[in-house]
Amino acid sequence: MVKTLVFLYLASESRLAFLEKEVQFHSLPREGEWLKLRNRDKGDYFAFRVQEVTHREGSLPEMMLDVLRSSETEYELFDEQELDEYIASYIAEEWLLKSCKENTRYKNHAHQRAD
């Protein structure tokens, strides 16, 4: 098993949440591959694309996951309540909420999720 430090972003139109967790894999996922993360409350319906993998000497590999996408150019955004629910559900899976700040990055390339 390969222990990896995984970074996950979840976004709404106004906020961007950054979560972190040590996750074990049978083999280290590579850039461009897709991951489904355990989420017992909300389900593991979403596949997150591995955006980058960084290897540090003397440390765990670090893996940055891409924000959910609806297409190659648009990002999926949660509504505000749904974002709070997903953050809470990942915290219940032992993810650490490192920050939640204003979303200035994905506003212009976003698609609001429709349920």
Language model segments and positions:
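Short alpha-helix capping/helix-loop boundary micro-motifs
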Residues: 18-25
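Glycine- and charge-enriched low-complexity intrinsically disordered segments
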Residues: 60-115
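Short beta-strand-centered aromatic/proline hotspots
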Residues: 44-55
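Short, well-ordered loop/turn sites that connect or cap secondary structure elements
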Residues: 28-30
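Short, basic/aromatic beta-hairpin or loop at an interaction surface
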Residues: 1-17
